[in-house]
């Protein structure tokens, strides 16, 4: 190079170097363009989603979520699913594979000699679109993002088995009911202002009181009370002398009256109010932005109302919920929601969940389901009272689980008929081949869950009105379905307690096990003498369950009932949420009965959730 530099002018040398660099760059670019662009391949469990599969998975994600949401029922707890984020970056298979150099090609896939779908071939591997796999094999999957990367998650089932915390006791948590939220179900029209319990629209838009739903409402709040921390409670009014140092937040317009007066029946002071219906009413500023369970003691002397003004997430608009002294169920007009709470001419406590009352009012419809709404309260602004009456103990709290539990317990006591049952006043058609159940039928599941509720109320209060009601509830267990009871006999040998006392018998599994749990609660609580009948019914039922469990095992899942045996039709396979309910129930029973059969079935049925199958011949 030094020899060349000595003989060549430096300007010529610069030109030669520049030409050499240009040639090098051109050759480099040409070589790079001839190479295929390779993308790093990420491993995934399950079926790969490439190209059009990704677009299909994204477009089907909403359908997937809607399908899972439909798995709700009064018997099985619906599982919440994480919604997959949308997937971007899909491309045409032919163009995409050429541009990006992917090693797959499109291939026709003939399905069962019936129809053809488009798949992907990569060497000896063939990939089918997951939208087809999902429907064909009844499996589930979604694309999720972790740290900015997409990952496809595949699952054989969508429902979850809850671990049994400890041996079951009649005064403890009821199964996994602390996870139930009965009042938010779209088939709950509202929480009745008069009764304080949910009104169901599951089988009719007119609404009716469904004992199973009411018992579940009580048991869920009882269980939440045991598993959640104590609520925060803000006291706004007690009418006592110690409140004199607090600022007077009551506004009393002209023509209205309010004063502290002594109530001899309560041995305390209360707030007396007089406010004509045509007036603005007397009002108490609240201003709570954290909690939305309001409670107050109330006694009306005339017709009246107590209204709560809410600031909402709906463009900060104000909505008012009116609790009125009439029997109207619920009404909604513009930004006013009305709940009838009855005359209330004697002292009673009104406890309302303002979130539920707001959303049920705004979502009010004439169909079976409440319309979905995103509206939420942001602030409890003030309380307004009209008419003539008395108020006391105005509070706002995080939760009021025991108020809900006792509302359900008291309803069960008040509405039990002379035969010991809770008649269901709506027609129920279980399926083709079964006679319709006309209004007034009993359900063993309702009897069992009601007993479990009443036993807990008795254990808390020692009030025998609850225990006596639970004892009377065993009567329908003793009578056959055609005798207006809930009993069926399988193969003239095994006693069974019917969730739906149909003709012919249906032998629904989960409802039967709930009826047994109720009998167990009662026999353990009532003692040797009073619990004798419950013990006998329980023992006969457990013998039947142990003998008949194999009839509900398909080798890959479970069966909801025995209609295939009774009617000679196709079996009614249990959805995954019912399957996990079966497992949860058996887990509970395995803690109170040492028979190994329950643990064996739990182990096998759990494996079905992961895709295991029984061996073939």
From Swiss-Prot:
Pathway: Glycan metabolism; heparan sulfate biosynthesis; Glycan metabolism; heparin biosynthesis. Substrate binds at residues 180, 185-187, 202, 210, 213, 216, 429-432, 499-500, 510, 514, 560, 563, 572-581. GO terms for molecular function: calcium ion binding; heparosan-N-sulfate-glucuronate 5-epimerase activity; protein homodimerization activity; racemase and epimerase activity, acting on carbohydrates and derivatives. It comes from the Eukaryota. Changing residue 499 to Q: Loss of enzyme activity. Pfam families: C5-epim_C, Glce_b_sandwich. It is found in: Golgi apparatus membrane. Ca(2+) binds at residues 238, 240, 268-269, 392. The record marks 180, 187, 560, 578 as: Critical for catalysis. The chain crosses the membrane at residues 12-28. Residues 29-617 are lumenal. GO terms for biological process: heparan sulfate proteoglycan biosynthetic process; heparin proteoglycan biosynthetic process; negative regulation of cell projection organization; positive regulation of cell population proliferation; positive regulation of SMAD protein signal transduction. Residues 1-11 are cytoplasmic. Its EC number is 5.1.3.17. Keywords: Calcium, Glycoprotein, Golgi apparatus, Isomerase, Membrane, Metal-binding, Signal-anchor, Transmembrane, Transmembrane helix. It catalyses: [heparosan-N-sulfate](n) = [heparan-N-sulfate](n). Changing residue 162 to A: Reduces enzyme activity by about 75%. Glycans are attached at residues 225, 303, 393. GO terms for cellular component: Golgi apparatus; Golgi membrane. Converts D-glucuronic acid residues adjacent to N-sulfate sugar residues to L-iduronic acid residues, both in maturing heparan sulfate (HS) and heparin chains. This is important for further modifications that determine the specificity of interactions between these glycosaminoglycans and proteins. Belongs to the D-glucuronyl C5-epimerase family. This is D-glucuronyl C5-epimerase. It comes from Homo sapiens. The lineage of its organism: Eukaryota, Metazoa, Chordata, Craniata, Vertebrata. The gene is GLCE.
């Amino acid at each position: 190079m030094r020899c060349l530099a000595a003989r060549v002018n430096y300007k010529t040398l610069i030109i030669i170097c520049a030409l050499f660099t240009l040639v090098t760059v051109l050759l480099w670019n040409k070589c790079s363009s001839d190479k295929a662009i390779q993308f790093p391949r990420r491993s995934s469990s399950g079926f790969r989603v490439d190209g059009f599969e990704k677009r299909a998975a994204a477009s089907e994600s909403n359908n997937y979520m809607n399908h899972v949401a439909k798995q709700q029922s009064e018997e099985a707890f619906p599982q919440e699913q994480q919604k997959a984020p949308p997937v971007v970056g899909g491309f045409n298979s032919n163009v995409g594979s050429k541009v990006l150099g992917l090693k797959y090609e499109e291939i026709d896939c003939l399905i069962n000699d019936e129809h053809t779908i488009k798949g992907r071939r990569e060497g000896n591997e063939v990939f089918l679109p997951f939208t087809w796999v999902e429907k064909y094999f009844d499996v589930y999957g979604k694309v999720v993002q972790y740290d900015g990367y997409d990952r496809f998650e595949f699952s054989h089932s969508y429902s979850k088995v809850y671990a049994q915390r400890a041996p079951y006791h009649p005064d403890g948590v009821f199964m996994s009911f602390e996870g139930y939220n009965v009042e938010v179900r779209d088939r709950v029209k509202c929480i009745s202002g008069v009764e304080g319990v949910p009104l169901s629209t599951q089988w009719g838009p007119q609404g009716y009181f469904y004992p199973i739903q009411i018992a579940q409402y009580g048991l869920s709040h009882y269980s939440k009370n045991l598993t959640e921390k104590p609520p925060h409670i803000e006291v706004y009014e007690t009418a006592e002398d110690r409140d004199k140092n607090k600022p007077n937040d009551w506004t009393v317009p002209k023509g209205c009256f309010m004063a502290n007066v002594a109530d001899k029946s309560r041995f305390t002071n209360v707030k007396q109010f007089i406010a004509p219906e045509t007036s603005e009413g007397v009002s108490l500023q609240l201003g709570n932005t954290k909690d939305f369970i309001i409670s107050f003691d109330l006694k009306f002397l005339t017709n009246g109302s107590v209204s709560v003004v809410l600031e909402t997430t709906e463009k900060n608009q104000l909505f008012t919920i009116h609790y009125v002294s009439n029997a109207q169920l619920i009404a909604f007009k513009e930004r006013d929601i009305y709940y009838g709470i009855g005359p209330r001419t004697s002292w009673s406590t009104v406890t309302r969940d303002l979130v539920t009352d707001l959303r049920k009012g705004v979502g009010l419809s004439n169909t079976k389901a409440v319309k979905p709404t995103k509206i939420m309260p942001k602030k409890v602004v003030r309380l307004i009272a009209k008419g003539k009456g008395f108020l006391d103990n105005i509070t706002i709290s995080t939760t009021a689980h025991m108020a809900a539990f006792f509302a359900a317990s008291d309803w069960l006591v008040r509405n039990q008929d002379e035969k010991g049952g809770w008649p269901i006043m709506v027609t129920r058609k279980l399926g083709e081949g079964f006679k319709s159940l006309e209004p007034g039928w009993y359900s063993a599941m309702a009897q069992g869950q009601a007993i479990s509720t009443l036993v807990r109320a008795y254990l808390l209060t020692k009030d025998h009105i609850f225990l006596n009601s639970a004892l009377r509830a065993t009567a329908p267990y003793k009578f056959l379905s055609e005798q207006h009871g809930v009993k069926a006999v399988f193969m003239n040998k095994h006693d069974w307690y019917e969730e739906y006392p149909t003709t012919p018998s249906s032998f629904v599994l989960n409802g039967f096990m709930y009826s047994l749990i109720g009998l167990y609660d009662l026999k353990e609580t009532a003692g040797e003498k009073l619990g004798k009948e419950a013990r006998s019914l329980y023992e006969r039922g457990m013998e039947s369950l142990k003998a008949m469990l194999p009839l509900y095992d398909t080798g890959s899942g479970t069966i909801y009932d025995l209609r295939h045996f009774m009617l000679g039709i196709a079996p009614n396979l249990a959805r995954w949420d019912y399957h996990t309910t079966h497992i949860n129930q058996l887990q509970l029973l395995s803690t109170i009965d040492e028979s190994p059969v329950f643990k064996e079935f739990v182990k096998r049925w759990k494996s079905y959730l992961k895709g295991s199958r029984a061996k073939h011949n």
